[in-house]
Amino acid sequence: MEIPSRIQLTGKQFFVLTGIVGARAVIGLEDPFRGTLAEEMPVEVAKIEQELQEKGLIDTADNEPVLVQELLEYIEVCSRTLLTIHMRVSGSDEGQKECFIYYSSSLVVKADIESGPDGARAYVLEALGTPSEAWLKIIRHLQLEDRKNRDTAPLAMPKGWFQQWMSAEQGEQEPRKYLLAQGYPESVVSALADCVSDPERYATFTAYYCPDLNCRIQGIELLRVKHSNWLIRNEGEQDQIW
């Protein structure tokens, strides 16, 4: 059976596959068996292995499940990576898209997060090529078109305020009032407020670097509008905005 270049898996299928290869925890993969009793797990796992065999993704002829080569490479990259990137991207003309990108020295694998037929979380695995090839695809996905640079110093507000502002958890006028009270130019603050209220594209970009399961996390947010791009990054107890 020919294996498609994009492999769709349910959360349970992805979880079982990582167990077959003896993988450690995969960033972005939620535990779909949470709440399942220990004595029920062998039956649940056997059922999922049967599904995977019917899809041609594993072979159980010798009683031990073995992944097909391409899928084995994907799962090993996802489960043994030192660097994982989590992206959420939304635009005015489309819904939110979410994915996790797993890096190895020779291959990068993307897992798009989708909704399965039953409404449960599903993962669509796809190779992005080498790290350099993958980076170009990531930048294209973010659609950061050239915009005029602003000749102003970065703005700053309390940590977490910007995400609350974007999600309307923070009163619409409160961040604006705060920034003006800090002495930032009204023209710059007004431009940022307009961007927050009507962005062309908004993305969150979080990198997890995990040697020995001790993760270092760095995140930025990217906001694109007609005349400018804005970059937001947590610095200490502040959101820094360029």
Please identify what each model-predicted range represents.
Residues K12-V16, K47, E70, E133-K137, ...:
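Exposed alpha-helical structural elements
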Residues M1-Q53, L57-E76:
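Short, amphipathic alpha-helical interface elements at domain boundaries
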Residues K55, E64-E73, Q164-F205:
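A short-motif feature that recognizes glycine-rich, charge-decorated loops
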Residues I113-Q182:
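Surface-exposed beta-loop interaction hotspot
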Residues R6-I7, C99-Y102, L222-L223:
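A general structural signal for short secondary-structure junctions and capping/turn motifs
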Residues V45, K55, D59-V108, D112-W135:
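Accessory beta->alpha helical hairpin/"wing" motif in late/C-terminal subdomains of nucleic-acid enzymes
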Residues I20, Y74, K137-H141, C195:
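Residues that form generic nucleotide/phosphate-binding pockets
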Residues S197-W242:
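Extended, charged low-complexity segments
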